[in-house]
Protein backbone atom coordinates (compact mmCIF):
# COMPACT_ATOMS: atom_id res chain seq x y z
CA UNK A 1 0.00 0.00 0.00
CA UNK A 2 1.15 3.51 -0.76
CA UNK A 3 2.72 5.07 2.32
CA UNK A 4 1.27 8.21 3.79
CA UNK A 5 3.27 10.98 2.15
CA UNK A 6 3.62 14.16 4.15
CA UNK A 7 2.30 13.04 7.51
CA UNK A 8 3.67 9.47 7.40
CA UNK A 9 1.03 7.86 9.55
CA UNK A 10 2.85 5.98 12.30
CA UNK A 11 1.57 3.53 14.84
CA UNK A 12 4.16 3.40 17.62
CA UNK A 13 3.53 0.81 20.27
CA UNK A 14 5.56 1.03 23.45
CA UNK A 15 5.24 -2.37 25.05
CA UNK A 16 6.06 -2.36 28.73
CA UNK A 17 8.02 -5.15 30.35
CA UNK A 18 5.29 -5.22 32.98
CA UNK A 19 2.55 -7.49 31.58
CA UNK A 20 -0.23 -5.64 33.44
CA UNK A 21 0.60 -2.25 31.93
CA UNK A 22 -1.23 -1.26 28.73
CA UNK A 23 0.61 -0.21 25.59
CA UNK A 24 0.45 3.42 24.53
CA UNK A 25 -0.39 4.36 20.97
CA UNK A 26 0.45 7.51 19.05
CA UNK A 27 -0.99 8.40 15.65
CA UNK A 28 0.39 11.78 14.58
CA UNK A 29 -2.10 12.91 11.96
CA UNK A 30 -0.79 16.39 11.16
CA UNK A 31 -3.55 17.87 8.99
CA UNK A 32 -1.21 20.13 7.05
CA UNK A 33 -2.11 18.61 3.68
CA UNK A 34 -5.15 17.14 1.94
CA UNK A 35 -4.94 13.37 2.12
CA UNK A 36 -5.41 11.11 -0.88
CA UNK A 37 -8.04 8.38 -0.81
CA UNK A 38 -5.40 5.74 -0.14
CA UNK A 39 -4.12 7.82 2.77
CA UNK A 40 -7.65 8.08 4.15
CA UNK A 41 -8.02 4.30 3.95
CA UNK A 42 -4.66 3.79 5.64
CA UNK A 43 -5.52 6.27 8.39
CA UNK A 44 -8.80 4.48 9.13
CA UNK A 45 -7.07 1.11 9.32
CA UNK A 46 -4.36 2.53 11.59
CA UNK A 47 -6.92 4.12 13.91
CA UNK A 48 -8.81 0.85 14.13
CA UNK A 49 -5.59 -1.04 14.84
CA UNK A 50 -4.64 1.44 17.55
CA UNK A 51 -8.09 1.51 19.22
CA UNK A 52 -9.72 -1.86 18.52
CA UNK A 53 -11.78 -1.80 21.72
CA UNK A 54 -13.50 1.45 20.74
CA UNK A 55 -13.81 1.14 16.97
CA UNK A 56 -15.42 -0.95 14.28
CA UNK A 57 -14.28 -0.50 10.68
CA UNK A 58 -16.43 -1.83 7.88
CA UNK A 59 -17.15 -1.46 4.19
CA UNK A 60 -20.71 -0.22 3.75
CA UNK A 61 -20.81 0.01 -0.03
CA UNK A 62 -18.78 -0.21 -3.21
CA UNK A 63 -18.41 2.55 -5.77
CA UNK A 64 -18.95 2.41 -9.52
CA UNK A 65 -15.22 1.80 -9.99
CA UNK A 66 -15.05 -0.82 -7.25
CA UNK A 67 -13.63 1.25 -4.39
CA UNK A 68 -14.93 0.61 -0.86
CA UNK A 69 -16.98 3.13 1.10
CA UNK A 70 -15.55 2.72 4.59
CA UNK A 71 -17.32 3.61 7.82
CA UNK A 72 -15.89 3.72 11.33
CA UNK A 73 -18.08 3.31 14.39
CA UNK A 74 -16.78 4.69 17.68
CA UNK A 75 -18.46 3.07 20.68
CA UNK A 76 -17.40 1.85 24.09
CA UNK A 77 -19.00 -1.61 24.39
CA UNK A 78 -18.36 -1.60 28.14
CA UNK A 79 -21.07 1.06 28.50
CA UNK A 80 -23.53 -0.69 26.22
CA UNK A 81 -24.21 -1.80 22.64
CA UNK A 82 -23.99 0.88 19.95
CA UNK A 83 -27.65 0.65 18.98
CA UNK A 84 -28.74 1.25 22.58
CA UNK A 85 -27.19 4.74 22.60
CA UNK A 86 -27.99 7.97 20.77
CA UNK A 87 -26.11 8.00 17.48
CA UNK A 88 -24.24 10.84 15.76
CA UNK A 89 -23.56 10.32 12.05
CA UNK A 90 -20.93 12.33 10.14
CA UNK A 91 -19.95 12.09 6.49
CA UNK A 92 -17.87 14.08 4.02
CA UNK A 93 -16.75 14.37 0.43
CA UNK A 94 -20.19 13.77 -1.11
CA UNK A 95 -18.94 15.59 -4.20
CA UNK A 96 -15.59 14.45 -5.52
CA UNK A 97 -13.96 17.87 -5.43
CA UNK A 98 -15.23 18.74 -1.93
CA UNK A 99 -12.43 17.01 -0.12
CA UNK A 100 -12.30 18.91 3.19
CA UNK A 101 -15.09 16.78 4.65
CA UNK A 102 -12.86 13.73 4.53
CA UNK A 103 -10.19 15.52 6.52
CA UNK A 104 -12.70 16.87 9.04
CA UNK A 105 -13.99 13.33 9.54
CA UNK A 106 -10.48 11.98 10.12
CA UNK A 107 -9.75 14.79 12.56
CA UNK A 108 -12.95 14.07 14.47
CA UNK A 109 -12.06 10.38 14.76
CA UNK A 110 -8.48 11.10 15.77
CA UNK A 111 -9.65 13.66 18.34
CA UNK A 112 -12.26 11.38 19.90
CA UNK A 113 -9.96 8.37 20.11
CA UNK A 114 -6.77 10.21 21.02
CA UNK A 115 -8.47 12.10 23.86
CA UNK A 116 -10.47 9.20 25.26
CA UNK A 117 -9.39 8.62 28.84
CA UNK A 118 -7.54 11.95 28.88
CA UNK A 119 -10.20 14.61 28.35
CA UNK A 120 -13.24 14.13 30.61
CA UNK A 121 -15.64 15.73 28.12
CA UNK A 122 -14.52 13.51 25.25
CA UNK A 123 -14.47 10.42 27.46
CA UNK A 124 -18.01 11.14 28.59
CA UNK A 125 -19.25 11.55 25.01
CA UNK A 126 -17.65 8.32 23.81
CA UNK A 127 -19.03 6.43 26.81
CA UNK A 128 -22.54 7.85 26.40
CA UNK A 129 -22.95 8.01 22.62
CA UNK A 130 -22.17 6.19 19.42
CA UNK A 131 -20.43 7.92 16.49
CA UNK A 132 -20.78 6.74 12.90
CA UNK A 133 -18.26 8.37 10.55
CA UNK A 134 -18.02 7.93 6.76
CA UNK A 135 -15.11 10.20 5.76
CA UNK A 136 -15.50 9.84 1.98
CA UNK A 137 -18.84 9.16 0.30
CA UNK A 138 -17.68 9.79 -3.27
CA UNK A 139 -14.55 7.65 -3.14
CA UNK A 140 -14.03 7.61 -6.92
CA UNK A 141 -14.40 11.37 -6.99
CA UNK A 142 -11.82 12.01 -4.26
CA UNK A 143 -9.37 9.66 -5.94
CA UNK A 144 -9.69 11.29 -9.34
CA UNK A 145 -9.81 14.86 -8.06
CA UNK A 146 -6.50 14.56 -6.25
CA UNK A 147 -4.82 12.23 -8.75
CA UNK A 148 -5.93 13.78 -12.05
CA UNK A 149 -5.84 17.28 -13.54
CA UNK A 150 -8.99 19.21 -12.60
CA UNK A 151 -10.49 22.62 -12.10
CA UNK A 152 -11.56 23.55 -8.55
CA UNK A 153 -15.14 22.75 -9.58
CA UNK A 154 -14.75 19.61 -11.70
CA UNK A 155 -14.97 15.94 -10.83
CA UNK A 156 -18.03 16.30 -8.60
CA UNK A 157 -20.01 13.48 -10.18
CA UNK A 158 -20.47 9.82 -9.48
CA UNK A 159 -18.63 7.75 -12.08
CA UNK A 160 -21.79 6.78 -13.94
CA UNK A 161 -21.17 7.27 -17.69
CA UNK A 162 -23.69 9.75 -19.08
CA UNK A 163 -24.28 10.94 -22.64
CA UNK A 164 -24.56 14.66 -21.94
CA UNK A 165 -24.68 15.75 -25.61
CA UNK A 166 -26.92 12.90 -26.81
CA UNK A 167 -24.55 11.71 -29.53
CA UNK A 168 -24.59 8.06 -28.52
CA UNK A 169 -21.27 8.30 -26.67
CA UNK A 170 -20.71 8.82 -22.96
CA UNK A 171 -18.05 10.95 -21.29
CA UNK A 172 -16.07 11.17 -24.53
CA UNK A 173 -15.18 14.87 -24.52
CA UNK A 174 -13.94 15.97 -21.11
CA UNK A 175 -11.53 18.84 -20.40
CA UNK A 176 -7.85 18.03 -20.80
CA UNK A 177 -4.63 19.28 -19.27
CA UNK A 178 -3.16 20.64 -22.51
CA UNK A 179 0.04 22.02 -20.98
CA UNK A 180 0.56 19.05 -18.62
CA UNK A 181 0.89 21.12 -15.43
CA UNK A 182 -1.58 19.03 -13.39
CA UNK A 183 -4.38 21.62 -13.59
CA UNK A 184 -7.32 22.32 -15.84
CA UNK A 185 -7.19 26.09 -16.19
CA UNK A 186 -8.97 28.50 -18.52
CA UNK A 187 -8.33 29.26 -22.19
CA UNK A 188 -8.58 32.72 -23.72
CA UNK A 189 -7.94 34.15 -27.19
CA UNK A 190 -7.21 37.63 -28.46
CA UNK A 191 -10.41 38.95 -30.02
CA UNK A 192 -11.30 42.61 -30.70
CA UNK A 193 -14.96 41.59 -30.60
CA UNK A 194 -14.61 39.62 -27.38
CA UNK A 195 -16.60 40.29 -24.25
CA UNK A 196 -13.61 40.89 -21.97
CA UNK A 197 -10.68 43.25 -21.70
CA UNK A 198 -7.61 43.29 -19.47
CA UNK A 199 -8.29 44.58 -15.98
CA UNK A 200 -6.56 47.98 -15.86
CA UNK A 201 -5.70 47.49 -12.17
CA UNK A 202 -4.50 43.88 -12.44
CA UNK A 203 -3.27 42.73 -15.89
CA UNK A 204 -3.56 39.03 -15.00
CA UNK A 205 -7.32 39.41 -14.68
CA UNK A 206 -10.06 40.36 -17.12
CA UNK A 207 -13.19 42.44 -16.71
CA UNK A 208 -16.33 42.47 -18.88
CA UNK A 209 -16.46 45.19 -21.52
CA UNK A 210 -19.09 47.87 -21.14
CA UNK A 211 -21.39 48.94 -23.97
CA UNK A 212 -19.34 50.86 -26.52
CA UNK A 213 -15.98 49.56 -25.29
CA UNK A 214 -13.71 47.55 -27.56
CA UNK A 215 -13.17 43.95 -26.62
CA UNK A 216 -9.80 42.30 -26.16
CA UNK A 217 -10.37 38.69 -25.13
CA UNK A 218 -12.79 35.85 -25.67
CA UNK A 219 -12.97 33.21 -22.96
CA UNK A 220 -13.00 29.72 -24.48
CA UNK A 221 -13.78 27.72 -21.34
CA UNK A 222 -11.65 25.11 -19.64
CA UNK A 223 -8.59 23.55 -21.24
CA UNK A 224 -9.56 20.95 -23.81
CA UNK A 225 -10.02 19.98 -27.45
CA UNK A 226 -12.82 18.59 -29.60
CA UNK A 227 -12.20 14.90 -28.99
CA UNK A 228 -15.18 13.55 -30.92
CA UNK A 229 -15.14 15.91 -33.90
CA UNK A 230 -18.61 17.31 -33.33
CA UNK A 231 -17.57 20.94 -33.36
CA UNK A 232 -17.82 21.33 -29.58
CA UNK A 233 -15.17 21.36 -26.88
CA UNK A 234 -15.56 19.79 -23.43
CA UNK A 235 -19.29 19.17 -23.90
CA UNK A 236 -19.36 15.66 -22.42
CA UNK A 237 -17.18 15.24 -19.35
CA UNK A 238 -17.39 12.65 -16.59
CA UNK A 239 -20.95 11.91 -15.43
CA UNK A 240 -22.96 13.90 -14.59
CA UNK A 241 -24.86 12.27 -11.74
CA UNK A 242 -24.77 14.47 -8.67
CA UNK A 243 -24.43 12.31 -5.54
CA UNK A 244 -26.39 14.88 -3.55
CA UNK A 245 -29.38 14.81 -5.93
CA UNK A 246 -29.70 11.02 -6.16
CA UNK A 247 -31.18 10.15 -2.76
CA UNK A 248 -34.53 8.45 -2.42
CA UNK A 249 -36.68 11.11 -0.75
CA UNK A 250 -38.27 13.86 -2.88
CA UNK A 251 -36.15 12.85 -5.87
CA UNK A 252 -36.93 14.57 -9.19
CA UNK A 253 -35.93 13.51 -12.74
CA UNK A 254 -33.26 15.32 -14.78
CA UNK A 255 -35.75 17.53 -16.62
CA UNK A 256 -36.61 19.07 -13.24
CA UNK A 257 -33.10 19.11 -11.83
CA UNK A 258 -29.92 18.32 -13.69
CA UNK A 259 -27.66 15.59 -12.34
CA UNK A 260 -30.34 13.64 -10.51
CA UNK A 261 -29.65 10.39 -12.38
CA UNK A 262 -32.03 8.01 -14.10
CA UNK A 263 -33.65 6.92 -10.82
CA UNK A 264 -33.10 7.34 -7.06
CA UNK A 265 -30.05 5.54 -5.72
CA UNK A 266 -28.74 4.74 -9.18
CA UNK A 267 -25.40 5.38 -7.49
CA UNK A 268 -24.50 1.92 -6.20
CA UNK A 269 -22.30 3.26 -3.42
CA UNK A 270 -25.03 5.63 -2.26
CA UNK A 271 -27.52 2.78 -2.19
CA UNK A 272 -25.20 0.68 -0.04
CA UNK A 273 -24.58 3.59 2.30
CA UNK A 274 -28.30 4.31 2.65
CA UNK A 275 -29.10 0.67 3.43
CA UNK A 276 -26.37 0.62 6.08
CA UNK A 277 -27.60 3.89 7.61
CA UNK A 278 -31.19 2.63 7.71
CA UNK A 279 -30.02 -0.24 9.89
CA UNK A 280 -28.49 2.22 12.38
CA UNK A 281 -31.82 3.06 13.95
CA UNK A 282 -30.20 5.10 16.72
CA UNK A 283 -28.96 7.89 14.40
CA UNK A 284 -30.40 11.03 15.95
CA UNK A 285 -28.31 13.70 14.23
CA UNK A 286 -26.41 13.96 10.95
CA UNK A 287 -23.63 16.32 9.88
CA UNK A 288 -22.65 16.21 6.20
CA UNK A 289 -19.58 18.16 5.11
CA UNK A 290 -19.47 19.98 1.77
CA UNK A 291 -17.04 22.71 0.83
CA UNK A 292 -18.04 26.15 -0.37
CA UNK A 293 -19.70 29.08 1.31
CA UNK A 294 -19.05 29.13 5.06
CA UNK A 295 -22.55 27.96 5.96
CA UNK A 296 -24.41 25.68 8.34
CA UNK A 297 -27.52 24.68 6.41
CA UNK A 298 -30.72 23.05 7.57
CA UNK A 299 -33.77 22.06 5.57
CA UNK A 300 -36.28 22.11 4.14
CA UNK A 301 -34.55 21.69 0.81
CA UNK A 302 -37.48 23.23 -1.07
CA UNK A 303 -40.33 25.51 -0.12
CA UNK A 304 -43.04 23.06 -1.16
CA UNK A 305 -42.12 20.68 1.65
CA UNK A 306 -43.27 23.23 4.20
CA UNK A 307 -41.44 24.48 7.26
CA UNK A 308 -40.39 22.00 9.91
CA UNK A 309 -42.39 21.86 13.16
CA UNK A 310 -41.63 24.83 15.37
CA UNK A 311 -40.20 22.62 18.12
CA UNK A 312 -37.64 21.23 15.65
CA UNK A 313 -36.86 24.72 14.39
CA UNK A 314 -36.09 25.72 17.99
CA UNK A 315 -33.57 22.88 18.22
CA UNK A 316 -31.96 23.84 14.92
CA UNK A 317 -31.82 27.51 15.90
CA UNK A 318 -30.19 26.83 19.25
CA UNK A 319 -27.51 24.52 17.87
CA UNK A 320 -26.99 26.42 14.61
CA UNK A 321 -26.40 29.75 16.31
CA UNK A 322 -23.87 28.12 18.60
CA UNK A 323 -22.21 26.70 15.49
CA UNK A 324 -21.78 30.26 14.19
CA UNK A 325 -19.86 31.06 17.37
CA UNK A 326 -17.67 27.98 17.21
CA UNK A 327 -16.77 28.65 13.57
CA UNK A 328 -16.48 32.45 13.12
CA UNK A 329 -17.62 33.61 9.70
CA UNK A 330 -20.10 30.77 9.17
CA UNK A 331 -23.79 31.56 8.81
CA UNK A 332 -26.65 29.37 9.94
CA UNK A 333 -29.13 29.29 7.04
CA UNK A 334 -32.18 27.55 5.55
CA UNK A 335 -31.33 25.66 2.36
CA UNK A 336 -34.19 26.60 0.03
CA UNK A 337 -34.70 30.10 1.40
CA UNK A 338 -31.13 31.34 1.75
CA UNK A 339 -29.35 29.26 -0.90
CA UNK A 340 -31.32 27.32 -3.52
CA UNK A 341 -33.85 24.53 -4.01
CA UNK A 342 -32.72 20.92 -4.26
CA UNK A 343 -34.47 17.62 -4.81
CA UNK A 344 -33.24 14.21 -3.71
CA UNK A 345 -30.50 15.46 -1.39
CA UNK A 346 -29.07 13.49 1.51
CA UNK A 347 -30.25 15.97 4.12
CA UNK A 348 -33.94 15.70 3.39
CA UNK A 349 -33.55 11.92 3.11
CA UNK A 350 -31.98 11.76 6.58
CA UNK A 351 -34.60 14.09 8.04
CA UNK A 352 -37.65 12.52 6.44
CA UNK A 353 -36.54 8.86 6.38
CA UNK A 354 -34.21 8.33 9.34
CA UNK A 355 -36.08 10.89 11.41
CA UNK A 356 -32.77 12.55 12.30
CA UNK A 357 -31.87 16.19 12.61
CA UNK A 358 -29.50 17.30 9.85
CA UNK A 359 -26.93 19.99 9.13
CA UNK A 360 -24.97 20.46 5.93
CA UNK A 361 -21.78 22.44 6.49
CA UNK A 362 -20.23 24.29 3.55
CA UNK A 363 -16.79 24.67 5.03
CA UNK A 364 -14.69 26.98 2.86
CA UNK A 365 -15.48 30.61 3.66
CA UNK A 366 -14.55 32.96 0.76
CA UNK A 367 -14.01 35.80 3.22
CA UNK A 368 -10.99 33.90 4.57
CA UNK A 369 -9.20 35.08 1.42
CA UNK A 370 -10.50 38.66 1.56
CA UNK A 371 -7.26 40.65 1.46
CA UNK A 372 -8.31 43.65 3.54
CA UNK A 373 -6.92 45.55 6.47
CA UNK A 374 -9.04 46.33 9.50
CA UNK A 375 -9.93 49.81 8.25
CA UNK A 376 -10.93 48.40 4.85
CA UNK A 377 -13.40 45.85 6.16
CA UNK A 378 -17.13 46.61 6.19
CA UNK A 379 -18.68 47.20 9.58
CA UNK A 380 -20.33 44.10 11.10
CA UNK A 381 -24.02 43.94 10.39
CA UNK A 382 -23.90 46.23 7.34
CA UNK A 383 -24.88 45.26 3.81
CA UNK A 384 -21.25 45.39 2.79
CA UNK A 385 -20.27 42.95 5.52
CA UNK A 386 -23.05 40.58 4.49
CA UNK A 387 -21.93 40.81 0.87
CA UNK A 388 -18.40 39.77 1.79
CA UNK A 389 -19.87 36.66 3.40
CA UNK A 390 -22.06 35.86 0.37
CA UNK A 391 -20.64 33.18 -1.92
CA UNK A 392 -22.60 34.66 -4.82
CA UNK A 393 -21.26 38.17 -4.25
CA UNK A 394 -18.31 39.77 -6.01
CA UNK A 395 -17.36 41.68 -2.86
CA UNK A 396 -14.52 39.22 -2.22
CA UNK A 397 -13.12 40.20 -5.58
CA UNK A 398 -10.72 38.32 -7.78
CA UNK A 399 -8.28 41.15 -7.19
CA UNK A 400 -8.34 40.49 -3.45
CA UNK A 401 -8.01 36.76 -3.92
CA UNK A 402 -5.06 37.30 -6.25
CA UNK A 403 -3.39 39.54 -3.67
CA UNK A 404 -4.01 36.83 -1.08
CA UNK A 405 -2.37 34.28 -3.40
CA UNK A 406 0.60 36.56 -4.07
CA UNK A 407 1.18 37.61 -0.48
CA UNK A 408 0.09 34.66 1.65
CA UNK A 409 0.99 31.59 -0.44
CA UNK A 410 3.48 33.15 -2.86
CA UNK A 411 1.36 32.84 -5.98
CA UNK A 412 0.43 29.16 -5.69
CA UNK A 413 -3.29 29.65 -6.33
CA UNK A 414 -3.12 31.37 -9.73
CA UNK A 415 -1.30 30.40 -12.91
CA UNK A 416 0.01 33.26 -15.07
CA UNK A 417 -1.28 33.27 -18.64
CA UNK A 418 1.01 31.51 -21.12
CA UNK A 419 0.84 31.16 -24.88
CA UNK A 420 -0.32 27.85 -26.33
CA UNK A 421 -0.99 26.58 -29.87
CA UNK A 422 -4.45 25.03 -29.89
CA UNK A 423 -5.37 22.56 -32.66
CA UNK A 424 -8.73 24.27 -33.22
CA UNK A 425 -8.44 27.83 -31.86
CA UNK A 426 -4.86 28.48 -32.94
CA UNK A 427 -2.90 30.94 -30.79
CA UNK A 428 -4.43 31.10 -27.33
CA UNK A 429 -3.33 31.56 -23.73
CA UNK A 430 -3.84 29.21 -20.79
CA UNK A 431 -3.96 30.41 -17.19
CA UNK A 432 -6.10 31.33 -14.21
CA UNK A 433 -7.07 29.67 -10.95
CA UNK A 434 -5.51 26.25 -10.35
CA UNK A 435 -7.14 23.08 -9.06
CA UNK A 436 -6.25 23.57 -5.40
CA UNK A 437 -7.78 27.03 -5.12
CA UNK A 438 -11.07 28.91 -4.98
CA UNK A 439 -13.00 26.49 -2.77
CA UNK A 440 -10.05 24.82 -1.07
CA UNK A 441 -8.07 26.75 1.50
CA UNK A 442 -4.27 26.52 1.39
CA UNK A 443 -2.74 23.74 3.52
CA UNK A 444 -1.74 26.07 6.36
CA UNK A 445 -5.45 26.81 6.95
CA UNK A 446 -6.52 23.17 7.22
CA UNK A 447 -5.89 22.61 10.93
CA UNK A 448 -8.08 25.47 12.10
CA UNK A 449 -10.85 24.49 9.68
CA UNK A 450 -10.97 20.81 10.65
CA UNK A 451 -10.71 21.52 14.38
CA UNK A 452 -13.51 24.08 14.53
CA UNK A 453 -15.84 21.98 12.40
CA UNK A 454 -15.16 18.89 14.50
CA UNK A 455 -15.89 20.91 17.64
CA UNK A 456 -19.24 21.97 16.17
CA UNK A 457 -20.05 18.27 15.81
CA UNK A 458 -19.06 17.64 19.42
CA UNK A 459 -21.21 20.50 20.69
CA UNK A 460 -24.15 18.99 18.83
CA UNK A 461 -23.26 15.56 20.20
CA UNK A 462 -23.37 16.93 23.75
CA UNK A 463 -26.99 17.82 23.10
CA UNK A 464 -28.14 14.42 21.93
CA UNK A 465 -30.69 13.00 24.37
CA UNK A 466 -29.39 12.10 27.83
CA UNK A 467 -32.41 10.55 29.47
CA UNK A 468 -32.59 10.10 33.24
CA UNK A 469 -35.24 7.77 34.68
CA UNK A 470 -36.49 8.29 38.23
CA UNK A 471 -39.11 6.53 40.31
CA UNK A 472 -40.53 9.46 42.24
CA UNK A 473 -42.99 7.67 44.47
CA UNK A 474 -44.28 4.25 45.48
CA UNK A 475 -47.32 4.88 47.70
CA UNK A 476 -49.57 2.25 49.26
CA UNK A 477 -53.24 3.02 48.63
CA UNK A 478 -54.69 0.17 50.67
CA UNK A 479 -55.06 -3.51 50.06
CA UNK A 480 -52.76 -4.53 47.25
CA UNK A 481 -53.05 -1.21 45.40
CA UNK A 482 -50.07 1.09 44.95
CA UNK A 483 -49.49 4.40 43.20
CA UNK A 484 -46.19 4.60 41.31
CA UNK A 485 -44.97 7.86 39.83
CA UNK A 486 -42.03 8.17 37.44
CA UNK A 487 -40.11 10.91 35.69
CA UNK A 488 -38.14 10.79 32.44
CA UNK A 489 -36.03 13.91 31.97
CA UNK A 490 -33.61 15.19 29.34
CA UNK A 491 -31.25 18.12 30.07
CA UNK A 492 -30.11 18.27 26.43
CA UNK A 493 -31.55 20.20 23.48
CA UNK A 494 -32.45 17.29 21.19
CA UNK A 495 -35.64 15.37 22.05
CA UNK A 496 -35.80 11.61 21.88
CA UNK A 497 -37.82 11.85 18.66
CA UNK A 498 -38.02 14.76 16.26
CA UNK A 499 -41.41 16.39 15.94
CA UNK A 500 -41.28 15.86 12.19
CA UNK A 501 -40.77 12.13 12.77
CA UNK A 502 -43.72 12.15 15.18
CA UNK A 503 -45.91 13.96 12.66
CA UNK A 504 -45.00 11.53 9.88
CA UNK A 505 -45.16 8.42 12.13
CA UNK A 506 -41.74 7.38 10.85
CA UNK A 507 -41.23 4.88 13.66
CA UNK A 508 -42.71 4.06 17.09
CA UNK A 509 -42.40 6.55 19.89
CA UNK A 510 -40.47 5.77 23.06
CA UNK A 511 -42.06 3.12 25.27
CA UNK A 512 -42.43 2.84 29.02
CA UNK A 513 -43.41 -0.70 30.01
CA UNK A 514 -44.54 -1.87 33.44
CA UNK A 515 -44.41 -5.55 34.41
CA UNK A 516 -44.48 -7.68 37.56
CA UNK A 517 -47.92 -6.60 38.76
CA UNK A 518 -51.31 -5.81 37.29
CA UNK A 519 -51.53 -2.25 36.01
CA UNK A 520 -55.03 -1.04 36.79
CA UNK A 521 -54.52 2.42 35.32
CA UNK A 522 -51.69 4.47 33.91
CA UNK A 523 -51.04 7.69 32.05
CA UNK A 524 -49.24 11.00 31.85
CA UNK A 525 -49.04 12.92 35.11
CA UNK A 526 -50.21 16.35 34.00
CA UNK A 527 -50.14 18.10 37.39
CA UNK A 528 -48.62 16.32 40.40
CA UNK A 529 -49.92 18.97 42.82
CA UNK A 530 -53.55 18.62 41.76
CA UNK A 531 -53.21 14.90 41.03
CA UNK A 532 -54.28 15.40 37.43
CA UNK A 533 -53.50 12.40 35.23
CA UNK A 534 -54.32 11.83 31.56
CA UNK A 535 -55.02 8.10 31.77
CA UNK A 536 -54.54 5.82 28.79
CA UNK A 537 -57.67 3.83 27.99
CA UNK A 538 -56.16 0.61 26.66
CA UNK A 539 -53.13 -1.33 27.85
CA UNK A 540 -52.09 1.17 30.53
CA UNK A 541 -49.00 -0.91 31.25
CA UNK A 542 -47.54 0.31 27.93
CA UNK A 543 -47.10 4.06 27.53
CA UNK A 544 -45.92 5.73 24.31
CA UNK A 545 -44.07 9.00 24.80
CA UNK A 546 -41.35 11.41 23.72
CA UNK A 547 -38.94 13.01 26.17
CA UNK A 548 -38.57 16.65 25.06
CA UNK A 549 -35.33 18.56 24.88
CA UNK A 550 -34.61 20.58 28.02
CA UNK A 551 -37.67 18.97 29.56
CA UNK A 552 -39.38 16.05 31.27
CA UNK A 553 -42.43 13.82 31.19
CA UNK A 554 -43.97 12.17 34.25
CA UNK A 555 -46.29 9.19 34.54
CA UNK A 556 -48.53 7.69 37.17
CA UNK A 557 -49.48 4.03 37.45
CA UNK A 558 -52.01 2.39 39.75
CA UNK A 559 -50.85 -1.19 40.19
CA UNK A 560 -52.21 -4.19 42.05
CA UNK A 561 -49.96 -6.83 43.53
CA UNK A 562 -46.99 -7.52 45.78
CA UNK A 563 -43.30 -8.07 45.20
CA UNK A 564 -41.10 -6.65 42.48
CA UNK A 565 -42.29 -4.19 39.85
CA UNK A 566 -40.13 -3.56 36.78
CA UNK A 567 -40.35 -0.41 34.67
CA UNK A 568 -38.50 -0.40 31.35
CA UNK A 569 -37.89 2.63 29.16
CA UNK A 570 -36.89 1.98 25.53
CA UNK A 571 -36.15 4.56 22.85
CA UNK A 572 -34.49 4.59 19.45
CA UNK A 573 -32.63 7.79 20.24
CA UNK A 574 -32.82 7.89 24.03
CA UNK A 575 -31.39 4.51 24.96
CA UNK A 576 -32.73 1.83 27.31
CA UNK A 577 -33.14 2.07 31.08
CA UNK A 578 -34.78 -0.31 33.56
CA UNK A 579 -35.86 0.27 37.17
CA UNK A 580 -37.15 -2.21 39.74
CA UNK A 581 -39.14 -1.27 42.84
CA UNK A 582 -40.70 -3.28 45.65
CA UNK A 583 -44.39 -3.28 46.36
CA UNK A 584 -44.88 -4.05 50.04
Q: Predicted segment positions?
A:
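Bacterial N-terminal signal peptides
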Residues: 7-16
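Boundary at the C-terminal end of the N-terminal hydrophobic targeting segment
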Residues: 20-25
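N-terminal beta-rich core of secreted/periplasmic extracellular enzymes
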Residues: 46-88
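Metallocarboxypeptidase
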Residues: 56, 68-69, 132-134, 140, ...
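Short helix-loop-beta-strand segments that form the rim/entrance of peptidase-like active sites
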Residues: 101-147
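Acidic carboxylate motifs that coordinate Ca2+ or other divalent cations, activating on Asp/Glu
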Residues: 163-167, 181, 226-230
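C-terminal beta-sandwich/jelly-roll accessory domains of carbohydrate-active enzymes
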Residues: 489-584
Amino acid sequence: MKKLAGFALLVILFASTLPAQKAETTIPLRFDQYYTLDQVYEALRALHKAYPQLTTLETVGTSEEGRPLMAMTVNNPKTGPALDKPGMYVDGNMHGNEIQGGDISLYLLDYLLGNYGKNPEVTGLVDRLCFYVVPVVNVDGRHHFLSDPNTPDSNRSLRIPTDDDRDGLADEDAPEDLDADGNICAMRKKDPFGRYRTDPEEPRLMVPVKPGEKGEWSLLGDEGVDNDGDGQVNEDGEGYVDPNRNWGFDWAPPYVQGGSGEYPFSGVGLKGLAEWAMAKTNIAFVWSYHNNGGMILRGPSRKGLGEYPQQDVAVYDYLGKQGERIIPGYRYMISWKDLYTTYGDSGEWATQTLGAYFYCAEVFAPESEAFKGVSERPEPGTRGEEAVRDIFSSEVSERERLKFSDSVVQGELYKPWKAFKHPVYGDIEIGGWVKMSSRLGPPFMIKDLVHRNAMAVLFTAKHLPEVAFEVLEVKALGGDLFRVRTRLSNPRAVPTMSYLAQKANLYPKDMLKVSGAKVVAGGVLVDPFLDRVSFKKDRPELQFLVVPGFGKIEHEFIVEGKGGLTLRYESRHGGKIAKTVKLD
